[in-house]
A protein has these predicted regions:
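Proteins enriched for Cys/Gly/acidic motifs involved in redox and nucleic-acid/cofactor modification
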Residues: 2-167
Length: 167
């Protein structure tokens, strides 16, 4: 499973290089699954290139529906018709924010809380608005609910996360 970044072209080139190396492993072990997710997969030109040049990839999904990972994996493993084709599930609708997803924390005393996604700045050097979508914020009630749950669980340090948390 490759969670990709597309902020720099070199990151894309590394992914293509790894996919090329994986082709021989896939020939030796056809049951091996190769899955790609993340910002790089939000670019249609990238997905098109992978579909034509890297047929050893089994599943592609984007940043907006990462929560569907288990569902897509189960489809590939258990659905006989899906085993013969590449599954591509990239959401272009960036307005939807899926709430109440399970969170795994690394530390018991601190946590991050996403308060917004995307960006409206469209800086000449940055691809974020194109792959993560326009700026959108979570509902304040949902943010507060999540923070209260974290505090009740013993978290004492909470970092608000987002591309532009001051917007």
């Amino acid at each position: 499973l490759y969670n990709t970044c597309t902020v720099r072209e070199n990151a894309n080139l590394k992914v293509y290089g790894h996919l090329g190396q994986l082709k021989r492993y896939k020939k030796k072990n056809p049951e091996m699954l190769t899955m790609l997710c993340g910002c790089m997969m939000q670019e249609q030109t990238v997905v098109d290139k992978i579909k034509t040049s890297y047929r050893n990839v089994d599943i592609i999904f984007g940043t907006h529906n990462i929560f569907k990972f288990a569902e897509l994996l189960a489809m590939r493993v258990f659905d006989t018709s899906a085993k013969k084709r590449m599954i591509v599930d990239v959401w272009k609708d960036t307005d939807a924010i899926v709430e109440e997803l399970p969170i795994e924390r690394k530390y018991s005393f601190k946590s991050g809380v996403n308060i917004m996604f995307g960006c409206n700045n469209f800086c000449s050097y940055c691809i974020v608005p194109y792959v993560r979508g326009r700026e959108r914020s979570r509902e304040p009630e949902e943010i507060i609910r999540e923070i209260r749950e974290l505090v009740a669980d013993g978290v004492v340090e909470i970092m608000l996360l987002g591309q532009n948390v001051n917007s």
